[in-house]
Every structure is written in structure tokens, then in C-alpha cells.
Amino acid sequence: MKYVGAHVSISGGVENAPQNAQAIGAKAFALFTKNQRQWTAKPITDAQIELFKRRMDEYGFVPEQTLPHDSYLINLGNPDAAKRQQSLDAFVDEMQRCAQLGLPLLNFHPGSHLRQVDEDQCLDLIVDSLNRALERTSGVVAVIENTAGQGSNLGYRFEHLAHIIAGVEDKSRIGVCLDTCHTFVAGYDLRTAEAYAKTMDTFEQVVGFSYLRGMHLNDSKPDLGAKVDRHHSLGAGKLGLETFRLIMNDGRLDGIPLILETIDESLWAQEIALLYAMQESP
């Protein structure tokens, strides 16, 4: 079964996310558990936690199909030790917030070398940060998102994801989220059945579908290999609708959250319905 949704607002409180997802016909959703552009946030109250969990049950959402995203400020590969520690502490706080809400996944961008160290050194710093974060927390899986390769961001090659996974000591608490726009602008084609099969076979060989815990479904404004991160509405960008039809009929992608981060949220309900309409009868 496919679980399609979108990254919904937590305006007014994290407890509002489930009803915002329900309102667009979602079967999954993503959210921030705090303001994503601030280092610290007030703790989630017991009342908020109770209401969040009650609404999850009421609207039929399952924690495993819910994909929280961490703050954009966090850089677990920051070459500056003090700044890396600040990121680590913030990441641990985000993992603890997920645990409080009963959510077993936390999606994050791997990190950036800021042109101060080489890629392998930065990947090793990310691994070290993750191992420290996992030691300080329990239960929540850290889900690495592949990136567009913009600037000095790592994670744009499947080999980067594999490097991080290889270094993480507790393999049960590491996973991957593939973003279709990021995958495409990083140089992996998805536009035809042949190209899609080749890219997914490469992912299986380098990383493995056993680690895939979610996907972000976004069309792309830039072209293949552009290494620029600009999402577009489904069918309006360079990927086109065929990519998403292939995803909706790929049995390997059953049971994980498939999350829209397309640019016009007024279209999300329509895009979710479109994706489900693409499913072919078995």
C-alpha cells in the first residue's frame, strides 16, 4: 500500500499537523516538531503530546508513515568543533521531541563541508556526530536525505549515503529518504522506465532498499545534473509525470511515507489524488 502525503504546517502547535494532513486527503505526512529556523524551542507540553497522539489515532495516521524533519540550521559535518557540537545538541533535542510524540523517524540533511575539509573527512564527522546522537537517545531512526549537491552539501551521491551507513554502529537506527528532485539534479535520471530502473538498481547496489524509510516526491525546476535545489509542482518541472507514475507502481516503495514538498500547497490535495489515480490494478 502507498502512503502519500505532504509536509504540513504546525502553525498553532505541533498537535495541528494530523488534522492539516487529513484535510488534504493524506495517508502520511511530514512536519517540523519546532521552528526549523531557530536553534532552540519551548518543550512540547504533555497536553500537546496527548492531543497529537489522539488526533493521529482519530485520523488514522501511523507513526511509521510520519516523517519529521529536523532544523535547517543543523550541520552534523561542520568542520568547526564548537558549531558541530551545537548541531549535535540540537539534533539530539529533535530526536527526543520525536520520541515524545511517539514518532520513530527523523529525516535530516547529512551536512556540509563548507569548503574547509574534503568530502571524506566531512562524511566521517557526520558519522561521528550520528554515533554520538544515537548513544544519547533511543528508539528513533536517523533518516538521511539525499541532497541536490548544491554548494558544499554532501549526500548527493548514493556513495555518500553508503559511507555514512557503513560508519554508523547501530544499523537498526539509520535509514535513507530519497528526494526525487534532489536525485535528478544530482545526476540520476528518473524520467523514463529505463532510466528509473537504472537509477533504482544503482541505489539498491550502493545503499540497499532495506534502508529506504521514506521519499520526498517533488518535480524539479532545474535540469538533470544541475546541482540546484528548486522543487516544482508535479508535472510542471523537468521530471514530468511519468516519474511519479513509476513510483506509484513500484512495490518496493509500499509501506513508507511518500511526501510532497512541491511549491504550491494549494495543489497538495489535487496532487495526492493524482498520485493515487496513477496506481494500476495488480
Swiss-Prot record:
One of its GO terms (biological process) is base-excision repair. Its cofactor is Zn(2+). CDD domains: AP2Ec. Zn(2+) 1 binds at H69, H109, E145. It comes from the Bacteria. Signal peptide: none annotated. Its EC number is 3.1.21.2. Transmembrane segments: none annotated. It is an enzyme of class 3 (hydrolase). Gene3D superfamilies: Divalent-metal-dependent TIM barrel enzymes. Zn(2+) 2 binds at E145, D179, H216, E261. NCBIfam families: nfo, PRK01060.1-4. This is Probable endonuclease 4. The lineage of its organism: Bacteria, Pseudomonadati, Pseudomonadota, Alphaproteobacteria, Magnetococcales.
